[in-house]
Amino acid sequence: MSANPESQKKLLIFPAIDEPRLKQVREAASGMSVVNAPDAATALRGIVDADAFFGKITPELLAAATRLEWVQSPTASLEHYLFPELIEHPCQLSNMRGLFSDVIADHVMGFVLCFARNLHRYLRLQQQARWAPVGGEDERSTFAAGPAFVSAIDRRHLHLADCTLGVVGVGNIGAEICRRAAAFGMTIRGVDPVCRSVPGIVDDVRPTDRLPELLAESDFVVIAAPHTPATFKLFRAEQFRQMKPTAYLINIGRGVIVDLADLTAALESGEIAGAGLDVFETEPLPADHPLWGMENVIITPHVAAASPRIAERHLATLLENVRRFAAGQDPVTLVDKRRWF
């Protein structure tokens, strides 16, 4: 393959994308050459003089590149995308973050509402045709009990405006979680390595080394962090001991952030009240795992980001970053390769 004219940039796509999306990429590329590689051999030839790449880069492809400036990952998470040579390479790397923030935040609030109002328990009771308020039917409040009487049923149903929600990782997803929780009147706490505030919602985002404070204060602890070297197994037995025994853990980040055996032990012992889990250290979660049988655990099969809106957002992010590269600008989703985000 002949080299590109010096004035013309080249974008290589592999695996190939369909024609309607390719047409939009060509329009966004604004004079760039766009090669939609149908197979690995074509991609290996095409990467030699490519300036930009979208798709799954491999060590073999990267080694053949001679002028690569920018790589666009098709995913938001990078733990399975990065490799040492890519980290050391001078090219810029961007990901697909920001596509799922509102959707995942909705999923988190679903977990929160289920635990606060015992909806998961009532669903099981409904399937058994049982009328059984959590706290006991005999403990229902009556006017005869007099003013200021709080029943056992009342105590087993949380008032969200009295609860504190702690977010571990206040990035795009974490910020949306904070906004939704604030709308319910909850007190919000956050820890983040960058200490990004959420204006008008959370002004005091603390550094990650203050995680113990957040755990001690929170009624709901939400993991919204990506998998990075710093977050691998961040939650172990020690962190569960630091949580309130009445607190719930919610993980929509990455499964490997939580030591699954330690979490299981904390739930079995009553060290924490329950867990809402969308991601796991091992996926699918084995059918014989104890978590499946726990009434205080809600399991969803890695679907927190599922939405019919995601595909259009994915394409929009790609097109915007292609436009920016063609114009000599940084991508909007530029990442720090050494930090994985």
Language model segments and positions:
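Oxidoreductase and adenylate-handling cofactor-binding alpha/beta cores
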Residues: A105-R124, A182-M186, A316-R324, Q329
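Rossmann-like adenosine-cofactor binding region
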Residues: R189, P193-P290
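Structural alpha-helical scaffold elements that stabilize or flank donor/cofactor-binding regions
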Residues: A43-G46, L61-A64, E213-L214, Q239, ...
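Phosphate/diphosphate ligand-binding glycine-rich loop within oxidoreductases
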Residues: D49-D138
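N-terminal glycine-/charge-rich "phosphate-binding" loop or analogous flexible N-terminal tail
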Residues: M1-A52, A326
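Glycine-rich NAD(P)-binding loop of Rossmann-like domains
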Residues: L123-E176
